């Protein structure tokens, strides 16, 4: 069972020009629903295999819309939290992890599902149907390294999609490919330094329904102290 309250500031949203905004924002309902999952897993000293099927049923799913879209103002940049409608998702996921020798490990995972949302009486795709992940890692003494890959396919329509004369949607978001890596050295249990590489393939990926692009290849050098 899940239950999520609206953001605190969404409950008191208003502008000087339109007091109706405040009334509308106070009508926000909690997002709540149920998730059912069952499956099997096999675990040994060097590997694990997990298989699961799941079903999600969510009411009053949170979303965001501009004043202009809601007809309560003209500001296209002022995003207001709203209840979009009902959400459902049924799918299957498989995950495999393997240790190779004393230092190496790898993992593979795939999820296929059918995420849909109903905002106006019609169920439409709300997210990518296919997700694939893969990773490889190495650890020896105080050194740790990892390389991870994510693929999102069969994605939902863009926010700016068009509708054909037959009523069929087209213009789905392109597939997404992202690869990241981390090199970490832990001097002791409290101190560590990490070099992180993001978007190694330097893909111009669309990251959301509004067709915003992710960052190009970039990296960070971080120091962590744990206590």
Features from the language model and the residues they span:
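Short, glycine/charged-rich beta-strand-loop motifs at protein surfaces that mediate ligand recognition
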Residues: 52, 165-173, 179-184, 191
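Exposed loop/turn and edge beta-strand positions of beta-sandwich/beta-sheet ligand-binding modules
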Residues: 22-24, 34, 78, 90, ...
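Outer-membrane beta-barrel "beta-signal"
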Residues: 215-227
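Short sequence motifs at beta-strands and strand-loop junctions characteristic
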Residues: 28-32, 59, 84-88, 126-129, ...
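Gram-negative outer-membrane beta-barrel transporters
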Residues: 54-57, 75-161, 186-192, 201, ...
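Hydrophobic transmembrane alpha-helices and their helix-loop junctions in integral membrane proteins
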Residues: 39-41
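Surface-exposed extracellular loop regions of Gram-negative outer-membrane beta-barrel proteins
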Residues: 1-37, 48, 53-79, 150-164, ...
């Amino acid at each position: 069972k899940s239950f999520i309250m609206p953001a605190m500031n969404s409950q008191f949203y208003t502008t000087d020009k339109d007091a109706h905004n405040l009334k509308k924002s106070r009508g926000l309902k909690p997002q709540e629903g149920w998730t059912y999952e069952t499956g099997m897993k096999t675990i040994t000293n060097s590997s694990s295999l997990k298989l699961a099927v799941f079903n999600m049923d969510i009411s009053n799913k949170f979303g965001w819309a501009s004043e202009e879209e809601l007809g309560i103002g003209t500001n296209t940049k002022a995003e207001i939290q709203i209840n979009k409608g009902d959400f459902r998702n049924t799918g299957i996921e498989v995950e495999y992890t393997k240790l190779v020798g004393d230092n190496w490990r790898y993992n593979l995972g795939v999820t296929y599902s059918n995420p849909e949302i109903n905002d106006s009486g019609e169920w439409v795709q709300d997210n990518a149907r296919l997700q694939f992940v893969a990773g490889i890692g190495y650890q020896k003494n105080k050194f740790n390294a990892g390389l991870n890959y994510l693929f999102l396919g069969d994605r939902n329509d863009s926010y700016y999609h068009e509708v054909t004369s037959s009523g069929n949607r087209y213009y789905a978001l392109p597939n997404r490919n992202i690869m990241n890596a981390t090199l970490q050295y832990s001097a002791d249990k409290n101190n560590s330094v990490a070099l992180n590489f993001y978007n190694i393939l330097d893909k111009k990926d669309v990251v959301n329904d509004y067709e915003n692009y992710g960052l190009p290849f970039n990296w960070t050098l971080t120091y962590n102290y744990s206590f």
